[in-house]
Regions:
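Membrane-embedded alpha-helical bundles of multi-pass integral membrane proteins
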Residues: 2, 6-125, 131
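Ferredoxin-type iron-sulfur electron-transfer modules and their immediate structural context
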Residues: 79-206
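A glycine-rich, aromatic-flanked flexible loop/lid motif
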Residues: 120-127, 147-148, 206-209, 406-408, ...
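Cofactor-cradling patches in redox/metallo enzymes
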Residues: 296-390, 423-533
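Cysteine-centered loop/knuckle micro-motif
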Residues: 158, 219, 502
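Hydrophobic alpha-helical positions that pack around
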Residues: 418
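Acyltransferase donor/substrate-recognition loop-hinge adjacent to the catalytic core
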Residues: 399-415
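Iron-sulfur-cluster electron-transfer modules
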Residues: 2, 136-145, 167-173, 180-331, ...
């Protein structure tokens, strides 16, 4: 099988694996001859050794030869372990034991103070940003390099790899180990290698990641692939500010987005004073204390398609009798795109500004319809303050209100499938509330729940230009084909980016399937019930 059936590992070197398998086979076979040469070999406890003794009747020379071959094979195996992927036999346990216990996809601040919190921008004391050299990697990242089993599970689930891009998450982890091997003498001398680890990774790999964390979820020994790429982005974005020619077409649109975030606190570059215009006729509190603050996010504030989702969410909350408000023009971007793009300084500036607004208004409960805002506000802002603020996704609140009887029992028309957003399902751990909120799902996609396939917008990819080679589909098209194959009438989504990407993907393949947010489905049913009465 190792020699002939290699679809998953096509193109990978066979030599190392074959040598190891040969050694294991040698150790196993020679052990039977060693047993056969023992006095009084037991057929009960050593049946194969006893069978060899009775059948082959080994000579003394054969036993001695087998014993030497046995010991040499073991010695060779032990010698090769540190130089091969089989170092995982030693390093897998500490890798699992010391794995990051924080919520998945929670990125590390630029600098932590003695209290464990992020150091404020004005107090930062750093000589460099991000990862450019092997010596910039944390000890946990280094262990990952030696713990990898080369099983390729991460490769198999990576959306960038599936769409033919340069990124292979398994090779990124291999690069960490190979870099150490190649620069061993320099590192042991306590010096910094001249080789740039960013060049080893490849900028086309670094910028292809959607940060969906499917690779992390698939890894049996808790290797964390994504931070190595996002830390490299930090260095490229905050220190070098120059990019390889082969990624310029991909990254340049992102640079315009960063400028928009800096000037207008939204990626579209639209005037910030228009941020709350979508709710002008909804009779909702604006920048006033309320039990629930709906954090619309940039997409729902400025994108016409997603404004409807925001309006329906507010309508649902008011239908349930909740005290709800919005921040209006005082709301700023959560900073997710800036952080995933590598501009950590901008992210921290946006986070500190939003937290100051939350404190001024007295925000205690936030509802977000964007999983990226849900994750960033609820998980990552805690390093900067606001630990007592509860953040929930709108599907969680809707389902809670349905259970309490404040909203009608959930239902939907026609057959419905559901696409799990990465930052809500796999990363956020919320799989049931979205499904329950719409009255269940009639047919699931092939890859669903924590194994769901990315829509292609995460990791700031929404603001980059995706390029694929002939013979490959874009990430959103791959996912849209899976969704269309369910035969459902409607695909429910819980993310504005997923809505955009899947709508485009379905259009590209000529599918007429409808794409609806959870809030849209729920509000349609509420209006239908009211009309029936």
């Amino acid at each position: 099988r190792q020699m002939c059936i290699r679809d998953r590992l096509k193109g990978k070197s066979q030599l190392e694996g074959n040598v190891i398998l040969l050694l294991i086979m040698t150790i196993t076979i020679t052990s039977f001859f060693v047993e056969a040469g023992e006095e009084g070999v037991s057929s009960t406890y050593e049946p194969i050794g006893a069978w060899v003794a009775d059948t082959i009747v080994p000579s003394t020379n054969l036993v001695v030869g087998a014993s030497w071959a046995h010991m040499l094979a073991i010695a060779t195996f032990l010698f090769l372990i540190p130089l091969s992927k089989h170092m995982h036999l030693v390093m897998a346990f500490p890798n699992v034991f010391f794995h990051d216990m924080r919520p998945m996809a929670t990125m590390e601040p630029l600098q932590r103070g003695e209290d464990g919190k992020a150091v404020p921008l004005e107090d930062l004391d750093l000589e460099s940003f991000g990862t450019a050299n092997y010596t910039d990697l944390t000890w946990r990242h280094l262990i990952d390099g030696w713990a990898c089993t080369s099983c390729a599970r991460c490769q198999d689930v990576c959306p960038a790899y599936a769409s033919g891009k340069a990124l292979n998450p398994m090779e990124i982890i291999h690069d960490v180990r190979y870099y150490a091997n190649d620069n061993y003498a320099t590192l042991m001398a306590g010096e910094k290698p001249e080789e740039d680890i960013i060049a080893r990774f490849g900028e086309d790999s670094i910028w292809a990641c959607t940060t969906c964390h499917a690779c992390v979820e698939a890894c049996p020994i808790y290797i964390d692939h994504v931070p190595k790429l996002t830390d490299a982005r930090r260095h490229l974005m905050m220190e070098r500010m120059e990019f390889d020619e082969k990624v310029e077409d991909t990254v340049m649109p992102l640079m315009a987005t960063i400028e928009n975030l800096e000037s207008d606190s939204n990626p579209y570059g639209l005037p910030s004073h228009e941020r709350g215009d979508w709710a002008a006729d909804l009779d909702v509190k604006v920048a006033e204390p309320a039990e629930y603050i709906y954090f619309a996010g940039c997409a729902a504030s400025f994108d016409e398609r997603n404004k409807k989702v925001a309006r329906d969410t507010i309508s649902i909350m008011k239908e349930a009798g909740l005290d709800v408000g919005i921040l209006g023009m005082q709301e700023g971007c959560s900073g997710d795109a800036a952080r995933r793009a590598g501009n950590e300084y901008l992210f921290q500036m946006l986070a500190e500004t939003n937290l100051a607004t939350f404190e001024e208004i007295g925000v205690k409960k936030i509802v977000a319809s964007c999983p990226h805002c849900f994750h960033t506000l609820g998980k990552e802002y805690k390093d900067y303050g606001g630990e007592d603020i509860e953040v929930m996704h709108h599907s969680q609140l809707i389902n809670h209100l349905q259970v309490e009887g404040k909203l009608p029992d959930p239902q939907h028309d026609g057959s419905v499938t559901y696409h799990d957003p990465c930052y809500l399902g796999r990363i956020g751990g919320e799989l049931e509330a979205p499904r329950n909120a719409i009255g269940g799902v009639d047919v699931e996609t092939e890859r669903t729940g924590k194994s769901s396939f990315c829509c292609g917008a995460g990791g700031a990819q929404m603001w980059m230009e995706e390029h694929v080679d002939d013979g490959y589909d874009r990430v959103n098209v791959i996912r849209s084909k899976e969704i269309a194959s369910t035969g459902a009438d409607t695909v429910a989504v819980g993310c504005p980016f997923c809505s955009t990407m899947i709508t485009d993907g379905l259009s590209a393949i000529g599918s007429e399937m409808e794409v609806k947010d959870i809030a849209e489905i729920v509000w349609e049913q509420i209006k239908a019930n009211d009309a029936a009465i």
